[in-house]
Amino acid sequence: MIVRSAHPSDRPNLASLLYYEQTVYRHLDWRPLLDWLGKSPFGVIEENDAIQAALACPSDPPEIAWIRLFAVDSGISPQMAWKELWRFVLDQFSQEQRPVQVGAIALNGWFQGLLEESDFKQQNEVVVLIWKVAHIRHEISGSFFKIRRMTEKDLPVVAQVDHLAFPSPWQLSENSIKAGHEQAAMATVAESEDGIVGYQISTALNDSAHLARLAVLPAYQNRGIGAALVKALQVDCDRRGLRSLTVNTQADNLASLHLYSKLNFHLTGERYPLYLFEMIP
């Protein structure tokens, strides 16, 4: 058994592992899992020229390294694979000689157990809300801003808005926002005479939509911009004939929960623990 860094040439074997195996953890992300090939740390266990397990958690942005994937072949123990690959990842990070947070959202029980055994600490929970699409006529107006469609040229500024609007570990890199924009069904910005002050990116599948990202510059918060972006999205969902709109937020983000409650979103009862591991050189 060999534990080593993944190489671009591993793509076919990794694709098979992700497709055929059931013990697979995927981070909630816009970027395809195999796009992380070539980034570090991304470790694999290889035996007899076959990849038995993989663990990837490159830093992006630099302050946070989300666990992007953990996949295990049915022929080996998830606990053993995790132990070997997590040791490999820790060694990779220790060589960088800088502090970093490693984050993971526990989407299933078996993965949550592995995190807790490795001294990850629960910091928060992600909760899910839903709005059942109804015919509505929102008054969408702002005395100092307008809402328009997001363009590719907006992405650098949108990334700056995101970085200022969210604390670590919730910030997104420009590359992640670009990937989100490419997959978006509906993406808009709120623009004042000072420039872009807020944005939203949403995806759609079949008859459902998901508000994947909503951000407003701190100096412009509590001025109706976030509500206007969501209202415009609700109108668009109705126009498209969609049946539901979901959104995730943190359990302790009271301002966000209050906003969605005012706009007739309701908690679904789904909750996913957020775990962090502090790497201090």
Provide a role label for each language-model segment.
Residues 18-47, 56, 165-197, 201:
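Active-site rim helix/loop that mediates acceptor-substrate recognition in acyltransferases
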Residues 106-124, 223, 227, 251-269:
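Conserved active-site alpha-helix within GNAT-family acetyltransferase domains
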Residues 1-14, 145-158, 268:
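A short beta-loop-alpha structural element at the N-terminal edge
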Residues 73-143, 273-276:
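Acyl-donor-binding surface of acyltransferase catalytic domains
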Residues 78-91, 216, 222-235, 239, ...:
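Conserved acetyl-CoA-binding loop-helix of GNAT-fold acetyltransferases
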Residues 127-145, 151, 248-254, 266, ...:
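C-terminal "cap" of GNAT-fold acetyltransferases
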Residues 100-105, 211, 245-249:
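Conserved hydrophobic beta-strand within the GNAT/NAT acetyltransferase core sheet
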Residues 19, 29-87, 91-93, 200-212, ...:
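Conserved donor-binding loop and adjoining core beta-sheet/short helix segment
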